[in-house]
Regions:
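Acidic/His- and Gly-rich active-site-bordering loop/insert found
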Residues: 1-111, 130
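Acidic/histidine-rich catalytic neighborhood of metal-dependent amide-processing enzymes
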Residues: 114-131
Length: 131
């Protein structure tokens, strides 16, 4: 997780930095492909590309019955996660303030908004599919 976060944080991807946003999109697309997602990159001419990652569920569709594992009603329906790939930092911020960890605190442009969220969503989906 931290290696992926470091890769993403060390890429300038401010809202006006199409090249950086496209790099983040490509990295995230590859990560989702590794997990068996069907990936589509939506190319945009003047702004950063977008990524759509789809994967079918692993259980039966929800029919109101109880889960054989827990006895609880489980919904094996759809999950939608929406994230942005850009940050609010200007070009050059990644070089001036690269990803670092001091104690239990990670810093760098986009660590909180939004790159840790990109990594967190990927790992949350991995965990859901492992259930």
């Amino acid at each position: 997780m931290l290696k992926l976060l470091e890769r993403l944080v060390n890429i300038d991807s401010g809202s006006a930095c199409k090249e950086g946003i496209d790099r983040v999109a490509t990295i995230m697309a590859r990560e989702y492909e590794k997990e068996g997602f069907e990936v589509e990159i939506l190319e945009h001419g003047n702004c950063g590309n977008a990524v759509i990652a789809r994967k079918s569920g692993t259980g039966p569709e929800y029919d109101g019955s109880q889960s054989p594992k827990t006895g609880n009603s489980r919904n094996h329906g759809k999950v939608l996660m929406i994230c942005h790939l850009d940050t609010a930092f200007p070009e050059g911020a990644a070089k001036a303030n690269p990803f670092t960890i001091k104690g239990n605190i990670a810093t760098g442009p986009g660590v909180v908004d939004m790159k840790a969220c990109l990594v967190g969503c990927l790992y949350a989906l991995k965990a859901l599919y492992a259930l």
